[in-house]
Amino acid sequence: MRNYPGSLHNHTDFSNIRLRDCINKIPDLINYAIELGHEVVAITDHETLSSFIQVEEYAEKIKEKHPDFKVIRGNEIYLTRNNLNAQNVNKDKGDDYYHFVLLAKDIEGYHQLCELSTRAWLRSYVARRMRRVPTYYRDLKEIILPNQGHLIGSSACLGGRLPRYFLQYFETENPEYRDVAKRWCVYMRDLFGEGNFYLELQPSHNPQQIFVNKQLLEISNELGIPYIITTDSHYLKKTDADIHEKYLNSQDGDREVKSFYASTYMMSTEELESYFPYLSPAQFETAYNNIRAIAAACQNYSIKRPLRIPHLPWLAYNHNVANIEFYLNKMPSLRKFLASKRSADPELVYAVIDGIQRHQDLQNDEAYEALEECLDMTWISSEVNNAEWSAYYLNLQKIIGECWNAGTIVGPARGSGGGFVLLYCLDIIQMNKLREHTKLFPWRFLNPARVSVLDVDVDISGLKRGQVLQHLRAVYGEDRVSNVSTFRTEKSKSAILTAARGLDLPPEEGQYLASLVNAERGQLFSLHTMYYGDENDNIPPSSTFIEEMNKHPDVWEVAQKIEGLICGLGIHAGGVVFNDEPFTNTASLMRAPDGTIVSGFELHDLEKCSLIKYDLLSVECMDKIQICLELLQQYGFIDSSKTLKETYENVIGVYNIDRTSEDMWKMVWEHKITSLFQMEQQSGIQAIAKTHPTSVDDLATINSVIRLMAQEKGGESPIDKYARFREHPEQWEEEMTQYGLTTEEKKILHKELDISCGLSIAQEQFMELVQMPEIGGFDLQWSDRLRKSIAKKSPKDYEQLTKEFYENMRQKHLSEHLCSYVWQVLIAMNRGYGFNIRPTMQ
């Protein structure tokens, strides 16, 4: 009995990044292919390789259960004549964006796909309301011909060049079109190499497709070019056709999709063959054997690579340090770096010494001790993670210097890096934690026990972002710098709106139905949660939502199917990737809708193939500061002869600005300072009015407190409790007394929490508390588990940690009063939202 091996031309929702096209998700497509008894499936989205990591990971996931099933990765490109662009396109002369399918046989084939896709996207342009991504014939010739045998090509659907020749023959009966089609086939066979070009038949009752299929069979016999049968799947099952139609029509109601996509779904052998009454059993067997031959020729290669920090150009450091032994003795870890075989490690030694010599506030034993701690953690993490973190630091040091050179101011510090003195030493941040009152911990930035990529938030002026990126490309290379892409998805609300549009409901009706979706802290509930509730998070079903969806079963059906689908391409808020080799050695590049160059992979997939991002965040308040400085210079209020960095440091540098000015703090209280960082919202304005901060530490605390929620509905809000304890410190004393704390136990908490008036309002605070011997003596790894359970709002994990916390208390005979107060009052407050404190140290 014959068995259709599987379709080598299929789409997933990654095909939606330019135009709504497909409702298949990767797991569903692969699972259904297996369910149908197929042996292979190829994923060939419309001019994008963005699914490749996720496809590989899902193929790995099913490998144990289905070891013989093969997943092939490819790309459906738009093949055009050479030099086609928006200005010279002429459909009357046959110009169009002809579909053509490419399959990668191995890792070299993948690299060729990366180069082809990148060329198409970088030359792309907007025409007829969508971005066009043309691949020229010369691209195929330049990339494939010198190194044949790594890519397989097939002629694609009716939108392909070869089928179009046949359709012209069908419409005119002019044999010249058939002759041109034959010559085109010979050209492609020679270009790809023997056995690497295939003719593609597709199932359809459409007379045009049937004619093309028959012509392909004849050409195959005449030229000896093999043929295959594919389904060009845009949805999974025949029963999904209506949902697919509604999804496509939600974007353009005039699209004729019913007939065009009538048979573009996954099929069983029996259903597939029913579309081909004109094929003999032998012809089916030939097509199926050709599919198996392609599957056998395609390797199970991996594009994932271990983390590798690029070696970008670094600053030049003085290697002739006269008193180097002094520094090696003060910071013994430097000796390991100096002797290391990792090339960046010795350079870091000289960079650190250079930084100490430039920073007077680092020339003391406390600073040497703090730097030694950072260096030791860096060394351990580099060894454990096999990552050259020294290169990361040196890269970032120069990148920030180039940002200044490009004409933007750079923010002093934000994120967990504020607690890492080494970053201050290297001028990556401008804040020395040793000079601040709020306790900041280096392990929040780099925890040797945690395998994760380092991340420093660098704030720049959004107004200067374009020129900054242009400057960075000039310094590091046009093909070495890229923004990080993001992919928009259909969230629950947008899924309802999209479904309503596709079903041609009145706009106000769709808006009403979408408005019924609830959210918590900015996160929309899923459709499933709205309809069925979520027992784990104690969220009941919404009776109103259920009632309305039952009134609109068609909306409910369509919305469920499209929720979660990728529906567009975007740009990461700050992520920029730097490389020390051409991007196409690792991944492809694309353009966002506004033309910005972005990576072919989103952030997490980039990291899986060895690339890491550096965060250059555009911040509105930085724009205003920069404009103010420029105006002050322009009108002669400050010296205009100095560099931007010198001016910034002299006028408003972290340790030059007067932080104690009573007039300034009065302006803060009265909301007369615009764009006060992260205090612009009403919650921040109200919190400042209630508490009257007088220091940056106060602002940092307030910013953390306003993100927390009351533990009980209707209970006292954390900001009200903070204001109360701040004005009446004795009330904190009374609360501790009520929990039975002794004077000594109160002293322990005063030491840690006086800065925040008795509240544990940040992740590092409660992590530090549970590590204290009197409270738990837990290690950093356990406290990080606690952080994750709170940050990810995981009740199950938190419940397990609660058991471990109290069991540890009993085993170590710790104070039940102190431990209970810490767990039930201080830590519990963070369960609404555990924020880290450094964002507001800016």
Regions from the language model: what does each represent?
Residues M1-Q842:
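Alpha-helical scaffold/interaction cores of sigma-54-like transcription cofactors
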